[in-house]
A protein has these predicted regions:
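A structural preference for short, pocket-lining loop segments at secondary-structure junctions
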Residues: 1-33, 46-62, 86-89, 221-224
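Hydrophobic/aromatic residues within transmembrane alpha-helices
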Residues: 8, 21, 76-78, 134
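Gly/Ser/Thr-rich loops at beta-strand to alpha-helix junctions
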Residues: 14, 67-71
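Glycine-rich phosphate-binding loop at the start of an alpha helix
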Residues: 38, 71, 128
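Long amphipathic alpha-helix in the N-terminal Rossmann-like dinucleotide-binding domain
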Residues: 40-42
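Active-site-proximal alpha-helical scaffold in enzymes
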Residues: 44, 74-75
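Crotonase-fold acyl-CoA enzyme core
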Residues: 52-68, 79-90, 97-99, 103-164
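C-terminal alpha-helix plus adjacent terminal tail
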Residues: 155, 159, 165-224
C-alpha cells in the first residue's frame, strides 16, 4: 500500500528536538568558514523542504511533540502539515539571546501559519512558550495530555481517512496559493550565514552557555 502519512517524533523522553549543533556553529564562526555554514544550513532546509512538500507525494506530514521543541527542532516541527503536542511540551526560538535568528525556515513556516506580527514576536523575544500558548495563537493544531500523543496521531489519521482525497487537495491548494519555495528557504540561509559571521565574541560566549544547557537536557532525557 502507498504511504499516506509520515510522523516526526522523538525517542528521547521529554525532548522532541533541541535544535542545531551550536558547538559546530561556534567552530565554523571562529574559523570564518562561510562555506561550512552554508553547507550546514542547506542540509537542514533540504530535509525540511522535503517534509514540507510531503516528499513530492500525496502524503500528510505530522509532527508529534512530546517535550522540549526549540530552535531548529521547532523549525522541523513547523515543516509538517499538522502539529500535535502533549501539554507538557515547550516551544521557543532562543537564537535571539545570542544575537542571531533562526535561519532554516522559522520565518517562512511561521509567517504562513500566523502572519508577520506574530512571527516576529516569536522570533525576537527568546521566550519559551507552553503548548497551550502555541495552540492559542494558531502555531500548533492540537494539544493533548501527557502520554496521549500517540493515540491522538492514530485518531487524527482515522478521522481524516474518509475525506482524505479532499484534504490532500486542500493541502495542495494551500501550498500553491501561499506556498514556500526552496529558493526562499535557501535565500534566508544566506542571510543567516551573514548574520552568524557578524557575531561578536560576547555573543559566542552566550551561545556556549546554551551548548551546556543542551548537553544537560539531553543527558537528563537519557537518564529517564
Amino acid at each position: 500500500m502507498p504511504v499516506e502519512y509520515t510522523v516526526l517524533a522523538s525517542g528521547a523522553p521529554g525532548v522532541f528536538n533541541l535544535g542545531g549543533d551550536l558547538s559546530l556553529f561556534i567552530e565554523l564562526i571562529d574559523n570564518r568558514d562561510r562555506v561550512g555554514l552554508l553547507r550546514y544550513g542547506s542540509a537542514c532546509v533540504d530535509v525540511l523542504y522535503r517534509n514540507y512538500i510531503g516528499h513530492g507525494l500525496p502524503i500528510t506530514t505530522i509532527s508529534l511533540v512530546q517535550g522540549e521543541c526549540l530552535g531548529g527542532g521547532f523549525e522541523a516541527a513547523l515543516s509538517s502539515d499538522i502539529i500535535i503536542a502533549e501539554r507538557q511540551s515547550r516551544f521557543g526560538f532562543p537564537e535571539i539571546l545570542f544575537n542571531l535568528f533562526p535561519g532554516m525556515g522559522a520565518y517562512s513556516f511561521l509567517d504562513r501559519r500566523v502572519g508577520r506580527k506574530q512571527t516576529e514576536e516569536l522570533l525576537s523575544t527568546g521566550k519559551i512558550y507552553s503548548a497551550d500558548d502555541m495552540l492559542a495563537v494558531g502555531v500548533i493544531d492540537v494539544v493533548v495530555g501527557r502520554g496521549e500523543g500517540d493515540a491522538e496521531v492514530a485518531a487524527a489519521i482515522k478521522r481524516s481517512s474518509r475525506s482524505r482525497n479532499g484534504l490532500v487537495g486542500i493541502a495542495g491548494a494551500r501550498r500553491r496559493v501561499n506556498g514556500i519555495t526552496y529558493e526562499e528557504l535557501t535565500d534566508v540561509v544566506h542571510l543567516w550565514v551573514d548574520a552568524a559571521l557578524r557575531l561578536a565574541p560576547r555573543d559566542l560566549k552566550l551561545m556556549q552557555r546554551l551548548v551546556s544547557r543542551q548537553t544537560d537536557m539531553l543527558a537528563s532525557s537519557q537518564i529517564h
